């Protein structure tokens, strides 16, 4: 089935995500995996054990930060999640996003809720979408930078 067909039949990009989150498997089905991208999540497996009988799955969660801005609280929660549920580091992208690698399936809901609680979104951070609207996040107080940041946030 094509990605476009999967999206069209996904009930607003919900698909069976909530059902498969409750299943004890360490990964998602191929159809749900395609939908997860639009929620800012990539399913991955450890390449060092590729080809063996059992794949070791983990997930990358990418935050979408319009204009590259985030509060101290938003950064600190991502840093804490990296230590608690990830591989202990964060990766900053050229599109002004933050990637949290190494999250296992059983910790995805808590990770996503923690991000959402501090108003960090992952929606549209991955997949075949416009991933972010970038602008200079420097905290200068001139009118032009303020207008650019407001426009980036509105467009994102």
Regions found by a protein language model. Give the residues of each.
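Short glycine-/aliphatic-rich beta-strand segments at the starts of folded cytosolic domains
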Residues: 11, 17-26, 30-69, 131-139
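Small-residue-enriched alpha-helical segments and adjacent helix-cap loops
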Residues: 58-156
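Serine/threonine-rich low-complexity intrinsically disordered regions
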Residues: 2, 29-31, 107, 146
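Intrinsically disordered, low-structural-confidence terminal and linker regions
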Residues: 1-17
């Amino acid at each position: 089935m094509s990605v476009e067909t999967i999206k069209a039949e996904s009930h607003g990009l919900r698909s069976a995500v909530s059902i498969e989150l409750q299943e004890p498997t360490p990964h998602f089905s191929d159809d749900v995996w395609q939908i997860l991208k639009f929620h800012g999540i990539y399913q991955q497996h450890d390449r060092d054990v590729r080809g063996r009988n059992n794949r070791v799955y983990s997930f990358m969660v990418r935050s979408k930060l319009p204009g590259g801005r985030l509060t101290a609280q938003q950064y600190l929660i991502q840093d804490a999640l990296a230590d608690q549920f990830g591989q202990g580091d964060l990766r900053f992208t050229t599109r002004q996003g933050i990637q949290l690698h190494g999250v296992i399936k059983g910790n995805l809901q808590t990770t996503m809720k923690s991000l959402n609680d501090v108003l960090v979104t992952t929606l549209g951070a991955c997949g075949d979408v416009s991933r972010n609207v970038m602008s200079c996040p420097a905290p200068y107080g001139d009118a032009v930078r303020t207008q650019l940041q407001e426009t980036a946030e509105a467009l994102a």
